[in-house]
């Protein structure tokens, strides 16, 4: 959630096994959104990694497939928001780490106590490319959008899943 000055991470979820995009969307809705009284219509932005779904033999990104699955789940032709990729250029991981660190110190980032993987990642990740980086990246893509001085200034910016 975003209050205009602070970002609240209310839930985390990682698929226990491979799932279709439709299964992911249904599970996200059931386990992450509805318990907080939220639905896809209240989502303003979505960020997803810039991977492709070539494993299925079609020229489409996973973000596009998630967008279609959200629209289908809601019985609409278009989703109320679009999953877009985050910026992953040189120095972007380090920049997100600085943004998140500053926000924590300034009281602009709050993480619900149920988000144990993210809390563990924030406490112990030291910059390596390991399992601790995945929760950091996922939360960082959205945190960057809301907490970065660049994006808050109204400058055009693209983020990744």
Protein language model regions, located:
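Mg2+-dependent endonuclease catalytic cores in nucleic-acid-processing enzymes, primarily RNase H-like
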Residues: 3-130, 149-150, 156-161
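Generic structural signal for bulky hydrophobic/aromatic residues embedded
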Residues: 125, 141-142
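Histidine-centered active-site/metal-ligand motif
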Residues: 134
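Short, hydrophobic alpha-helical segments
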Residues: 142-150
């Amino acid at each position: 959630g975003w209050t205009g000055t602070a970002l609240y991470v209310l839930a985390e979820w990682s698929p226990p096994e491979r799932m279709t995009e439709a299964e992911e969307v249904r599970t996200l809705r059931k386990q992450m959104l509805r318990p907080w009284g939220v639905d896809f219509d209240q989502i303003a932005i979505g960020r997803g990694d810039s991977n492709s779904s070539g494993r299925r033999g079609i020229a489409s990104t996973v973000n596009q497939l998630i967008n279609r699955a959200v629209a289908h789940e809601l019985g609409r032709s278009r989703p109320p928001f679009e999953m877009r990729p985050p910026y992953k250029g040189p120095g972007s991981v380090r920049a997100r780490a600085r943004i998140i660190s500053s926000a924590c110190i300034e009281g602009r980032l709050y993480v619900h106590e149920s988000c144990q993987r993210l809390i563990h990642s924030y406490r112990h990740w030291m910059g390596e490319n390991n399992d601790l980086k995945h929760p950091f990246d996922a939360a960082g893509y959205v945190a960057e959008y809301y907490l970065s001085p660049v994006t808050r200034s109204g400058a055009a910016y693209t983020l990744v899943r």
